[in-house]
């Protein structure tokens, strides 16, 4: 990682570590070594330590004095809170759709759906298109900037979503749901769009129950539990 001024460098390290947690590169429950992280990024321990503190404030990292730092396990309660916020905002944005939709944004969404249908997409490419699709729908309502607030609050939700994507052989079911939402929006059928959106967003809860049945170690059960210092593999 290129060295810049101190403030920029710390921000870059924080964003990098946050992304590693959200993409499951740093798995739920994994032990975190400040020395190893600093060495891998070519920086001192100080900005790494500061970044871990910020991530702890977001609930993405747990710091136990004299024991160490660990990636927080996915917390179903935090997932539910983030889902509640996201659903309220996205359904509200559908209610706020104007009678005349911006043709440029509609075109972007249509192109996005075409790219989602590609067979060679990896998980992160699809996840990025998924995020852009939902943000685009909010832009249609004139509230695209609200997505920043939603995105900042859904760290645990995004990890659960990624776990769900890894469980599915193909994202085709999600693409079909996106198309149903898009068609309802462009046809002016807001009630149908709301129903389709609600079904789509709540699918994550089924994913959590299915994954927790065979990989309970990825999920939080008791916030007071001190973890064992070991690494957890999400998948082989």
From Swiss-Prot:
Domain HTH gntR-type: 7-74
Location of the DNA-binding region in this protein: 34-53
Key words, A-Z: DNA-binding, Transcription, Transcription regulation
Gene3D superfamilies for this protein: GntR ligand-binding domain-like (1.20.120.530), Winged helix-like DNA-binding domain superfamily/Winged helix DNA-binding domain (1.10.10.10)
Pfam families in the record: FCD, GntR
Any GO molecular function: DNA-binding transcription factor activity
Protein name: Uncharacterized HTH-type transcriptional regulator in unstable DNA locus
Organism encoding this protein: Streptomyces ambofaciens
Upper classification of the organism: Bacteria, Bacillati, Actinomycetota, Actinomycetes, Kitasatosporales
